[in-house]
Amino acid sequence: MAAKRKAAAMNAVDDEPVDPSDELAFYCLGGGNEVGRSCHIIQYKGKTVMLDAGMHPAKEGFSALPFFDEFDLSTVDILLISHFHVDHSSALPYVLSKTNFKGRVFMTHATKAIYKWLIQDNVRVNNTASSSDQRTTLYTEHDHLSTLPLIETIDFNTTHTINSIRITPYPAGHVLGAAMFLISIAGLNILFTGDYSREEDRHLIPATVPRGVKIDVLITESTFGISSNPPRLEREAALMKSITGVLNRGGRVLMPVFALGRAQELLLILEEYWETHPELQKIPIYYIGNTARRCMVVYQTYIGAMNDNIKRLFRQRMAEAEASGDKSVSAGPWDFKYVRSLRSLERFDDVGGCVMLASPGMLQTGTSRELLERWAPNERNGVVMTGYSVEGTMAKQLLNEPDQIHAVMSRAATGMGRTRMNGNDEEQKIMIPRRCTVDEISFAAHVDGVENRNFIEEVSAPVVILVHGEKHQMMRLKSKLLSLNAEKTVKVKVYTPANCEEVRIPFRKDKIAKVVGKLAQTTLPTDNEDGDGPLMAGVLVQNGFDLSLMAPDDLREYAGLATTTITCKQHITLSSASMDLIKWALEGTFGAIEEIGTDEDAEKEDQQSESEEKQRMKEEADEEIPMEKPQAYLVMGCVVIRYHPRTREVELQWEGNMMNDGIADAVMAVLLTVESSPASVKQSAKHNKHHHHHHHDETDTLKFLNPHAAQDAEERFARLLMMLEAQFGSDIAPIERPRVPSSTESATTTTNGNGNSKSDSEQLSSLESKTDGATPQDPDTLSELEAAELSRLHALGIPVPGIEIKVDKHVARVWLEDLEVECANAVLRDRVRVVIERAVETVASMWSVGRSSKTITNGGGKEIAGTGADDVASKPGLEVAARA
């Protein structure tokens, strides 16, 4: 597996440049610093996930929608709906039918079943009653029903992978079907809680922290900030006290609730209380709404998704029904004895005391608002608020106990408000006096401040993003969480983005490859063992963000990939190079070459047919020439070279891949230059020089075949000049006049008046200002001596006596007969000497070394006498060694 970065490296990430692909982007299109129209976008590694699509219950028309125009919805891969409440799901039909959204939508089975009826009823209510004089229809009932098939359902605790995004829903405990989603993108784990509850109630499974998963980012609600609720038993007692107080004075109790969710929990509480208090059983409990009746069937269907209390009631009532023998007896836990269902207020006989659970919970429109306007003027009546009240709604205003409330349903029923006057709209409002009592006892299925903080601490995510909360509540919770950082080694980062605000958080996740197949059987070194262990090589396969390392043979089984091996062949015909020369050239480039002998199978592959093989062997037998089997060598462990001596054909064979192709190209480059490169010519010349036992006709044949074997001195001299120009520039000229020996000595030593010899540096003290090599002697005598010397040099194969090299202000002379270098500058002299030696070795033997006696100076300017090349080469410390 890939090595993980050490802690020090991880901590230094913040100081390093961050790749945009390593940043998690979070956009709040709704639900930022507010409660309502929840909609969030997360982007990471090119993947986009949309969380919820709700509408604001306190707003109407387009203003109730999230800010969809601020984001390109066509880039969204998947949309996850946490639960069916309107502030989390009612904008979904608009997204699917009115926008360019192209992704997939997921929710749980129970959520979709209730969502169908809830949104359908919501569309009908909004189309029949509104506080606006000009209503805006965002989508129709047909839009809603036509988009239902686009919604896919998933079960709790099951993992699904969509476009390399892994999602797992967990019970959230908020309402039936409500889910927390664990989202994994490229190893980054994000937990979105939605609305969740950790409280033990009568029918739902409370939310728990996913086990065995390290959460990197937690996106959680902050509805109640840091405020805490009283214990559950105290709230139930307060609820019953408030309800019975109103009933005892002959009033009616209005409990505004969402049609589904907390309403079912309150019905269970009331049913249980009425069961134990016979004096109340004569007072009816009403649950009004056509949608509520239909959705109760869903609750009866998904008993298996509820907690043990509901399952116990189900088994108990099933046993009672079986014991009675009456099959008509209802046996479900949702078949109430004291709760009656009403389709509408038209069938409601408003006489005497009662308890009425009506929707919607925010009292904006609908049945609950109509009953509020009807019962508010009577001081014997009472309103009990049990859910969370969103800012800007009538439910929130009613908690302040105003003296008057605005009549909406009465105005719509009487037709008032449809004729607008030129005056202020405030003057046209119908106000109703409020004399009823108002109590608030929270049974909202949201975590309070203590439960939320404990959940965040248990998850231990390094990054927390707070949503779904009013700004002041959210900031109080943020301050509390940041205050806990003083006790932590790893500080928690808390973000509270507002609507349309972008948050970018850098994350660098280690890329971990899973080793599978044959490679998984390799024993890896333990921590106690020294060394890095064996080198593991294989094929790295990426499927989405998952990496797997496997042997090529396992690709079909573990990756589902079909493998194809491409064998490449290349044929090159050489005119004269032998296998020895080829091997020598390849070894100089690639190191040791492995000889693998002959390959009969390869020979068979080269033969096109059996008839051609027989014909070839017959011809070879007629010629009575013994067949030489091809020689095979392996270069770099991947390229096979076969040399056929008779045809001088070289065959290359290798398995095609990026690395092998590069090696094969390099081998072909060596083969294509093996007959023309100066180094190869020199090597072949060395081999041919000392084998005098070869037949002359064979040697002549090889010279004829090799175009470099018959090169003359002029060609070699031109190559020498080319190499020198590459090193010292173009200011290089041949020396036309040779060095002439003095008449008094056979050597070239110059003596001063005292009989001491002068060194070359003393003789060349004025060389940089002179351009010819003659001494002031008689021109006629000098011309004859020069002519004789030139003739002698030409006879030796030396085209010119020497070469003059000018570099800036310095001049160096090279005499080609003995390769002596003369220069007043020691650095340039040494440099020229080294280049000359390398050049002569490259272009092979230049010419014979003169046999006349010479004086060659060493580094100290002392004279060393010699009689030939052998003597010169044998002297230690020479500046120039003659090359034979």
UniProtKB/Swiss-Prot annotation:
GO terms for biological process: mRNA processing; secondary metabolite biosynthetic process. This is Endoribonuclease ysh1. Belongs to the metallo-beta-lactamase superfamily. RNA-metabolizing metallo-beta-lactamase-like family. CPSF2/YSH1 subfamily. It comes from the Eukaryota. The gene is ysh1. It is an enzyme of class 3 (hydrolase). Its main location: nucleus. One of its GO terms (molecular function) is RNA endonuclease activity.
